[in-house]
Amino acid sequence: MSKLSVVILAAGKGTRMYSDLPKVLHKVAGKPMVKHVIDTAKQLSAEQIHLIYGHGADLLKERLADEPVNWVFQAEQLGTGHAMQQAAPFFKDDENIVMLYGDAPLITKETLERLVAAKPENGIALLTVELENPTGYGRIIRENGSVVAIVEQKDATPEQLKITEVNTGVMVSDGASFKKWLARLDNDNAQGEYYMTDVIGLANQDGFKVAAVTADDMMEVEGANNRLQLAALERYFQRKQATALLLAGVSLADPERFDLRGELEHGKDVEIDVNVIIEGKVKLGNGVKIGAGCVLKNAIIGDNTEIKPYSVLEDSSVGEQAAIGPFSRLRPGAELAAETHVGNFVEIKKAVVGKGTKVNHLTYVGDAEIGSGCNIGAGVITCNYDGANKFKTLIGDNVFVGSDVQLVAPVKVNNGATIGAGSTITKDVAAGELVTTRVPQRHTADWERPSKKK
């Protein structure tokens, strides 16, 4: 049986989060917990992903609008068995159905593949975990390797309480069997709910074999019911990613102070200082150095470039042998060529900057093209917006723009031109020209400053 579908339980409110956000939308590594689970289901090549939703329905659908899921509404949350009953009409008899939880984001493809492989031809397979302190969890009771029961803490004998293997709730069986067992579930218990743990008893009654696979790491199956548990998942996940990067040759100044909230592709001899955040898809070339406190989102950085402390780069690219920062901001559409220098308190947006050009201090460059070998002085502003529309500034090669210059777009400064400090440029500048628009300097001898009136 090669066909497989996944059911993700995501209808809970998450009262202990004390939040208006549905629990499964709280994030780990910058991504909603349920999105992690959906991505894992995709890795399994699931034919269908049934998402059981309830609380925060509109918000959940909005945030996951692009996901290929079958939305299954659970009006009342009456237990895990009740949630599965809502999805049962969509099950195909001859496919495996894997049940997952939207608030347990760290489950891996490899563990689930082991679980599916362990499922008997006629039977069910559970994912279990070994805990040093299993207090409060349902114990796995085995006979001859097969699971015969899950005994809750309050019902366990002293001997059963010594068992450290516990139920995670993750399981797999074929669609036909699940539909049969789900139809027989009842809510004859103190909570008046339908539980998937009762399916194990039904399977044994029917003579089906119940297999179990133990997760290698308990954190894979940990859920988050409150923000403390959410923070623990975040730290574990970040530590795991940092470990992988260190083993791949990336130098992290302090693995405990590094956050990867997306995908990082890197070359050799990359150095990352403390409190750096990586978001989206980021590519770092060989010998790249990232300073403390930087944030990189969807950025490409060329070989041997240094991003100095507290710089923010988003949807932008920087060529090789460049220097950015400290305290620089590259906004979407910034494309910097090799050997460029961008200094402190410079903001660049939707602009191309040519090879070797320097923009060193206190400058805004937006909607512009700047050639190679230019010097853009301190306090230069490309005035690109008239309150309604954006206009472009074009600067050729080897242009020198002095300090405190305003370039009022649309305007073009051609190759080799020089703009004197303090000028406001409203007309095109020809190649090789020197342009100044300063008011002539006046001198008044023997000037006396006004004195305060008594």
Curated annotation (Swiss-Prot):
InterPro entries for this protein: Bifunctional_GlmU, GlmU-like, GlmU_C_LbH, Hexapep, Hexapep_transf_CS, MobA-like_NTP_Trfase, Nucleotide-diphossugar_trans, Trimer_LpxA-like_sf
Residues binding UDP-N-acetyl-alpha-D-glucosamine: 9-12, 23, 74, 79-80, 101-103, 138, 152, 167, 225, 331, 349, 364, 375
Database matches in Pfam families: Hexapep, NTP_transf_3
Gene3D superfamilies on file: Hexapeptide repeat proteins, Spore Coat Polysaccharide Biosynthesis Protein SpsA, Chain A
Keyword Cytoplasm: yes
Family per similarity comment: In the N-terminal section; belongs to the N-acetylglucosamine-1-phosphate uridyltransferase family.
The name this protein goes by in its record: Bifunctional protein GlmU
Organism in which the protein naturally occurs: Actinobacillus succinogenes (strain ATCC 55618 / DSM 22257 / CCUG 43843 / 130Z)
